[in-house]
């Protein structure tokens, strides 16, 4: 399987595109219309909520998410991403912080531009948005999960820093923690035999030969680079032995192996 690890902000969501703020009064009607027109089983109205009192600050974060995808993702950029996926047969693996909204919700958002069908049903480990706020027990479980995961990420980051030191004389040349998230995911998903990561963060240390730097959005040159990288099926991609610790395996047994998300 070919995987495209997708960041969103700075890749398909340009920081200069803020058109959603011109349409705040339309958010509720937009979510109702999308639910009806797309008819994909996702309730945008329920996801976004219906509260708005005329003050832009009262609109929910999820209403802004829907509007950002609808108003601010440039069609030409979406088509560049689609061209990579159609040409290579790759699936989207969300590496963006947006994945914390939950994969079900992200599929709904991607569907606004017809991209939901490309989404792989797993993502690098994160705590699903909203899942553990239902009662005191689940809130406690969420806190435990976050604590355990932070310790594992710190262990991975420390060893990855040692394995992939950056040039201290260059800006932003060091190892980025997102690289560790992707590498841990690849280690478990041996079905992936080709991958590329599109990101506005520097993921070159640890993803050598599989990273395309993007900012503020995907350009034609980066489309060609991504397609070329995905043409080389050189996987699977195991973690370095030094990272395969008992602590990592215990964390996976506790939080990952029984999950349907990771």
Over which residues does each language-model region extend?
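Alpha-helical substrate-recognition element adjacent to the catalytic core
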Residues: 3-137, 143
